[in-house]
Amino acid sequence: MLTIDALKKEDTFFLLAGPCAIEDETMAMQIAEKIVTITNRLDIPYVFKGSYKKANRSKVDSFTGIGDEKALKILRKIKETFGVPTVTDIHETQDAFRAAEYVDVLQIPAFLCRQTDLLVAAAQTGKIVNVKKGQFLSPTAMTFAAQKIVDCGNNQVMLTERGTTFGYTDLIVDYRGIPQMKTFGFPVVMDVTHSLQQPNQTSGVAGGLPQLIETIAKAAICSRGRWFIYRNSSGAKQSIVGWCKYAAIRFVGTVVGKVA
């Protein structure tokens, strides 16, 4: 069982990775299988990440999910098939207990990190709660988000750095935030790929800089980061599973120094 005490160990590195959203069972299972193979070989604890729905899209016709229950059942199947814990986002208070029946970690999106009722609902499930730092917040302000969860009697908190707004269409990572948030006594996660988003594009779809993934990961390691989120989108035309296998090997190898 995934426990927050195990994740707090200074020498523990673990990886949260998977598709941005659950788009179909075959894709999710194949991605999980590839990453489990890689992380088992490198002896890295792994948590499968996949949103069962995406509620924070720019356009009303953007993809949001395949159906809540269908996607949650896929997350449960991945956990049972591969023996790995799972994490998914929640967006509303009623999502908390529903998702908690299927996954091990509830994740609070960055845009929602100050929503008290949502944080309280997540805390009351007794699950680990990963709160992503809002692009508009200082690292030190995240202590208040964490305290809302702790005050509910749940000390299973993780905090995630995912970049800070830098103008209208870009993000920048201030790596001072990693050691600053670690002083609160909770594991700090580095969301490598979302830190490279370029939001507010004229197309209504966020862009990104995937060629800088390794740079962001290496810099986080130097900042005493030991936990990473890596996710991919299937919007590209190439084989998602093949691409994910290659990208995961490169990413994991970068941060642990075991693969060229």
Predicted regions and their residues:
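Glycine-rich, proline-tolerant flexible connector loops at the mouths of alpha/beta enzymes
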Residues: 16-27, 46-68, 232-243
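Short beta-strand segments at enzyme active-site cores
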Residues: 15-16, 44-51, 85-90, 190, ...
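Catalytic alpha/beta core domains of metabolic enzymes, predominantly
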Residues: 8, 125-232, 236
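Active-site mouth loops of central-metabolism enzymes
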Residues: 17-30, 58-66, 84-89, 108-110, ...
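Catalytic beta/alpha-barrel core
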Residues: 66-67, 81-95, 104-117, 128-139, ...
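Alpha-helix-loop-beta-strand connector modules within alpha/beta enzyme cores
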Residues: 33-42, 61-87, 122-128, 178-188, ...
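N-terminal amphipathic alpha-helix/helix-capping segment at the start of soluble metabolic enzymes
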Residues: 1-16, 73
